[in-house]
Amino acid sequence: MSLSKCFKNSIYPSINLPLTLSLLEEWCLIYICGIDSKKHLQNQFTIDINCLKKEEYKLCAHCNFNGKVWATMFIFHYKKGFAYIIRKSIAKIQIKELKKYAIFSKVEIRELDDIYLFGLSGFNAKFFLSKNFVDIPNKNCSLISNQDRTILWFSEPCERFLLVLSLKDLLLLKRKENEITLLNNSKQWLLFDIEAGFPIIDKQTSQKFLPQSINLILLQAVSFDKGCYYGQETIARVFYKNLNKYSLYLLSSKGNINPKIGSIIEMKKEEKWYRIGFLLAIVHVEFNRTVIQAVLNKSINIQNIFRIYEFKNIFLIKN
């Protein structure tokens, strides 16, 4: 899709954002169907799939045997089965792991390459959707889905919509080019997810953290009532014995730097720097600002100052 008003490298804060369409090239859609699809997902994912309603999506995780998170995803009913939106960098590995335990199950698991993922946000986003699509989701019905399109509603950090579109709807968006102020790449949506507190797990940080360490309990992305699933024993033990030492934070700094995902985060105490956590995601925002998502030890004080190992820029926790 090519639009003339294209500012792919300009990422803006959510406040006072004009109508913006973001190409979500860093995410993909995985489809699972077959008579055993629900049972298989129930045995693998952290939420209770049996309680997932048709008109909603849920954040959840897929963990390894030791309770460490392979990936996080938004899952929902889709066509004759289920679909989930996941970071593209980890998708192939996660699918392979999910298929490993499906040998004796009647399921099909694959990435869909005939759909298009976009994020719509900013001024009058809801109005734009209502003009072009008959039904749109809201706080009472967070997902609208039919054979051609699916739309997810998000409230944080601003009202926004994730569009799962067919080629037909993609062409419709192209015809509405003049109504869209900005077309950004997926970094705009990534900024929103960071600000909303959704953990970003890419290939570099897969199998590194328990769900508790990336706030998935607080986000209601883990069920303790559904029974067994991979990693459940460790996750439950850490939860009930209060053994988790980490939490998810948003930090901000002036200037632009380019550290690697998984880099070490350091905290200054007195005159020394101490290793305190790890970098999950980074976005460069307009007006010379860098926003990062990090997993940090919960012993920190929010007034502390931080830096990324081998970089001088000072980061502060953003409330």
Swiss-Prot record:
Please list the GO terms describing molecular function.
folic acid binding
Which residues are involved in binding folate? W27, W189
* Pfam family name, one: YgfZ_barrel
User: What's the family?
Assistant: Belongs to the tRNA-modifying YgfZ family.
Q: Where in the cell is it found?
A: Cytoplasm
Could you tell me which species this protein originates from? Answer: Buchnera aphidicola subsp. Schizaphis graminum (strain Sg)
Q: What is its main location?
A: cytoplasm
Q: Which named protein is this?
A: tRNA-modifying protein YgfZ
| PANTHER family linked to this entry | TRANSFERASE CAF17, MITOCHONDRIAL-RELATED (PTHR22602:SF0)
According to its UniProt entry, the function of this protein is described as: Folate-binding protein involved in regulating the level of ATP-DnaA and in the modification of some tRNAs. It is probably a key factor in regulatory networks that act via tRNA modification, such as initiation of chromosomal replication.
Q: Which GO terms describe its biological process?
A: iron-sulfur cluster assembly; RNA modification; tRNA processing
